[in-house]
Amino acid sequence: MKLVLIDGEHYPDVISWAIKKLGDVCCAVFLGGSEKIGSIGEVERKIGVKVYHSPNYLDALRRALEENKVDEVVDLSDEPVLNYEDRFRIASLCMLYGVSYRGADFHFKPKPLKKTKKPSLAVIGTGKRVGKTAVSGFIARTLKEIAKPVIVTMGRGGPEEPELIEGDKFEITPEFLLKFAESGKHAASDHFEDALTSRVTTIGCRRCGGGMAGFPFFDVVDEGVKLAENLPNDLIILEGSGATFPPYRADRYVVVVGAKQKLDFVRGYFGTFRVSLADIVVVTMADSVGEERWKALRDAILEINPDVDLHFIAFRPRPLGNVSDKRLGLVMTSSEALPKAKKHLEGLGAEVPYTSDNLSKRPLLWRDLEGFRGIDAVAVELKAAAVDVVTRWALEQGIEVIYLDNEPVNIDGKDLRKAVLELGRALLGGRA
């Protein structure tokens, strides 16, 4: 059945004519405008279907979607009642309810979201380089206290067939990763990073393309989830890729937002869809912005999802090896995070004479590595060219490789670890 969006800038006779041409219309939502109508009751009598209305048109649309079996929302409105921002808000709400939304020259159609057979938690982001994998790894480490999680990742460098890494059963060494990379595979994929930093079982999957709302174009996540469901693990963590997420309706959601992202990517477009899904929102790299930005992010997120548990965190480098009394070269992707990471490692007793923020820029990375002289070890995040460039270079030079994790630390007085444990207990105690 169709739900139509209507306004008072169209005469009721015109709306009635359009509804008859559409056919199969169960109800309408009145968006506003009064130039060409009298009362809502008059409109309802003229068009012959129930009309939902509210001072907030999204509340009316939400109620209509919950009370009717709607497959498609059809937009019969226009400027000035609706603008581009309004239409993205409507599209986000339609994605949340799993219904199609189309107008005269646009069509947003959600992919069907499947359910896992085991309790599931999705970790998704509002963009790339927001620290989603670091947050996912932290969640897995935390939930190991009360569960046996398995992480299903999806990535543009992921394997064509789901790849199982039993990170809880063997040590992932630089030599192992390099050998894997030399076989032609991407050894810095998220499932390797999660297995290395959290010592849990992970399953890596491939995806290609990502739509505006976050649905992948092609992926092999179904096969990965089936594999996870046949393992003895009791909780599945579904990890997104960039702003794209696995096509599953998880039981719980953690949404990761970068503090320096454009605010419109959070409160507009399909950011509202992602934030609406969240049980917990983690704003990462919050130490890189001021109070005014904190307030803007808080206001935007809570306006979309008033009940969400909101956390502002900073990342602290967590070396997966001893750095004390060692002379290090430090390699990362973020130029902004680099000075803070250097200072933190020096606080752990390391000397850090050389740094590079070109981990994702291979030609510049090679140049930087050639300047690293007289070091005992290289500390590097497991992403981008960490294995096939940095690890290979270090092992050829006889230099120790120490991989870095990014540990989320609250800077807002709250406790993300406690929140994750509470979410995990609620999830394991009974699925929504």
UniProtKB/Swiss-Prot annotation:
Belongs to the cyclic 2,3-diphosphoglycerate synthetase family. This is Cyclic 2,3-diphosphoglycerate synthetase. Its EC number is 6.5.1.9. One of its GO terms (biological process) is gluconeogenesis. HAMAP family: Cyc_PG_syn. Catalyzes the formation of cyclic 2,3-diphosphoglycerate (cDPG) by formation of an intramolecular phosphoanhydride bond at the expense of ATP. Keywords: ATP-binding, Cytoplasm, Ligase, Nucleotide-binding. It catalyses: (2R)-2,3-bisphosphoglycerate + ATP + H(+) = cyclic (2R)-2,3-bisphosphoglycerate + ADP + phosphate. It is found in: Cytoplasm. GO terms for cellular component: cytoplasm. GO terms for molecular function: ATP binding; cyclic 2,3-diphosphoglycerate synthetase activity; ligase activity. Gene3D superfamilies: P-loop containing nucleotide triphosphate hydrolases.
